[in-house]
């Protein structure tokens, strides 16, 4: 059966809807960036770090350490702006592969946290996902990455 008949609309209209949706998301992101332009980078760092710690603590409540080993980090692209300059001055993170600024799970978690030195990829992914989500709420373009060991 033809796609247009099945769903009752043309592919052209559907692609226009997708373009409009993408444009609205881009505009929304620009508004968030504008609103958060004057936010102190220290506040952004601590808010995101607290979100990561809370996510890891909730995930590990009444559990044992998952044994699947790996690495996780958050990549901010492009590697410029107030927040990235703050990270560079503080010695947090380094240059990411294929561009951007990479913040490791070990940089995110406090030194005294019981799950900071874990090898579990699941725990690291949970923390980095929460950290990236918090940064995105401030209008930063970032992704959470992981790889198995």
Where are the regions a protein language model picked out?
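Polybasic, lysine-rich low-complexity intrinsically disordered segments
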Residues: 12-13
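Generic short N-terminal amphipathic or hydrophobic helices
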Residues: 16-18
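N-terminal leader/targeting segments
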Residues: 23-93
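Acidic, low-complexity, intrinsically disordered interaction modules
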Residues: 96-112
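Short, compact, well-ordered microdomains
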Residues: 111-149
